[in-house]
Amino acid sequence: MHAPQLRKPAAGEIPESPGVYRFWDAHDRVIYVGKAKNLRARLTSYFADPALLHPRTRAMVTAAARLDWVIVRTEVEALQLEYNWIKQYEPRFNIKYRDDKSYPYLAVTLAEPVPRLMVYRGKRKKGNRYFGPFAHAWAIRDTLDLLLRVFPARTCSAGVYRRAQRIGRPCLLGYIGKCSAPCVGWVSEEQHRQIVLDFCDVMGGRATEYLRRLEKDMRAAAAAEDFERAARLRDDAAALRLAIEKQTVVLPENTDADVIALADDDLEAAVHVFFVRDGRVRGQRGWVVEKVEALDTADLVQHFLAQLYGETGAESADVPREILVPVAPSDTETLERWLSSRRGGRVTIRVPQRGDKKALLETVAQNAAQALHLHKVRRAGDLTARGRALREIQEALNLPDAPLRIECYDVSTLQGTDVVASMVVFEDGLPRKSEYRRFALRGVGGGDVGAIHEVISRRFRRYLDERMQTDSPIDDGTGPDQPRVDAAAHHRKFSYPPSLVIVDGGAPQVAAAKKALDELGIDDVALAGLAKRLEEIWLPDREEPVILPRASEGLYLLQRLRDEAHRFAISYHRAKRSTSMTRSVLEGIPGIGETRRKAFLRHFGSVQRMRQATVAELAAVPGVGRRTAEVVFAALHGADQ
């Protein structure tokens, strides 16, 4: 049966217009976002006989507490709003694309005054260019090693670059011809940027055109009897030709396309992409998709394209002219219009029927099938172990349900100074690092016990405060035709309660945490402590600990939680200690206020590097004169003695 709190809207309440809808749970978190050409037809289908619904759709409807929707003018607007909401709320019942590994990219930091070429993983930054993804980081380094001879661009970090500027000498790459050394003025910033832009042109698919230009310049230099330059251009052309030959030619020259294939079963699907530029495979990427509802291949392709190209932000170069898919998406025309607007030129979605493109699509499909098989083999053991661990913890602690969300707290201190605490979160037995939190504790007495009481009080006081705000609507000022934004819709730091709280320690720490929860009137959160020495599990109001077998999966999971909380607390404590030590050294110097302290640290990065600097280098910091630099130099070297 449907959850009793979810009211079925009357048919007349739901418009027949295109729009986007949201399901919310009892904690006012968005759990599913969808779009529809006809909202009435789509939403009514969720309230059919539960036995006819896909099992995961049934689970979603059962978990839902309320439903709302927004009308939009066009299907393209619906597609864009659906993507934005999925990105904003991260609903747990929407399809989640998880990379089967963290693929590296070759990043070009065009947003910086002196751009840098680097291996990069993580969220893309506006203004930079990204090439790839590559299967391995060494593949990027091999490519760079070949191309830096032709395009001697900067690859060093900001610290190395500033050091070269200070000492007036480039690094080794400058001396062997693999960097043009803008740090010491061998080329100007404008000349270096042109080198980088030429590199981007070659990586973007214009390698053959650039090679022809090199060969033309080489012949012209030879004709002018400038044999030294001709020899250098010949070597550059050979290096570029070698880099091109390392990439497999799969389609005719000037073909820019993304080739996408899927392999799926009832529960999951693997998606694989080959990125083809200038007829060559420039990179590939794979995802594993959890099928939350009954979706056919056309629907999967639709969802995947929306998320893949929505993810790239405003980088029009990431959207190719042609996208090859095994089955046409469920709304090809809308997708093509949306992608064309993102690219700034026409984009075609095609299903190849014969020839090289069909053969390449079959190759990508084989990769997807292999990825799905490997994923299931790996996950079979992992899922079994995690499920067993959660069941063992449930049984050992006598919990009503398996603890799907566990929070663990640890305190770090050094002789009572810089007391900090950490909160780490595991969901379904896996770390949820976006939910980790750090606490700075000031004026807390009682050692670890007092610190545990303080951090638990702060965490759950915030939880109660944010839960109180969930009924407070916020008008985002976009007008009556735009969706109202609820306060609870936005990600809050502490708005979701855990199934189980673990504290690092024994009976005293557990008692302190229990006292904090009691003071706040919270009685529906399970609590336990894990003592380090004998790995005993302490429960509130029990004189004897619970002992799990040494080889049990449940104990292993609790140890991972405790160790992760300890690592996170220690790293925060070290950072705070380093900051306070730096501040204490500079605070004792006459004439150095907060502004100048920040200027010194921005320029040098650390007190150690300041100690290595000369008076002239200290005086080069903005806002610092010669006299102040001499005072700082004397104070720093006096501190050494």
Swiss-Prot record:
Listed SMART domains: GIYc (SM00465), HhH1 (SM00278)
Residue span, GIY-YIG domain: 16-95
Gene Ontology terms: biological process: nucleotide-excision repair; SOS response
What GO molecular function terms would the record report? DNA binding; excinuclease ABC activity
**Keywords on this record?**
Cytoplasm, DNA damage, DNA excision, DNA repair, Excision nuclease, SOS response
- What's the superkingdom here? Bacteria
Recorded hits in InterPro entries, A to Z, give:
GIY-YIG_endonuc, GIY-YIG_endonuc_sf, GIY-YIG_UvrC_Cho, Hlx-hairpin-Hlx_DNA-bd_motif, RuvA_2-like, UVR_dom, UVR_dom_sf, UvrABC_protein_C
Q: Where in the cell is it found?
A: Cytoplasm
Record-annotated UVR domain positions: 208-243
Report if keyword DNA repair is assigned.
yes
Q: Which Gene3D superfamilies match?
A: 5' to 3' exonuclease, C-terminal subdomain, GIY-YIG endonuclease, UVR domain, UvrC, RNAse H endonuclease domain
Q: A GO CC term?
A: cytoplasm
NCBIfam families, from UniProt? PRK00558.1-5 (NF001824), uvrC (TIGR00194)
| Described function | The UvrABC repair system catalyzes the recognition and processing of DNA lesions. UvrC both incises the 5' and 3' sides of the lesion. The N-terminal half is responsible for the 3' incision and the C-terminal half is responsible for the 5' incision.
Please state which protein family the record places this protein in.
Answer: Belongs to the UvrC family.
Q: Share what the entry says about its subunit structure, partners included.
A: Interacts with UvrB in an incision complex.
Give the protein's recorded name.
UvrABC system protein C
UniProt lineage: Bacteria, Bacillati, Actinomycetota, Actinomycetes, Acidothermales
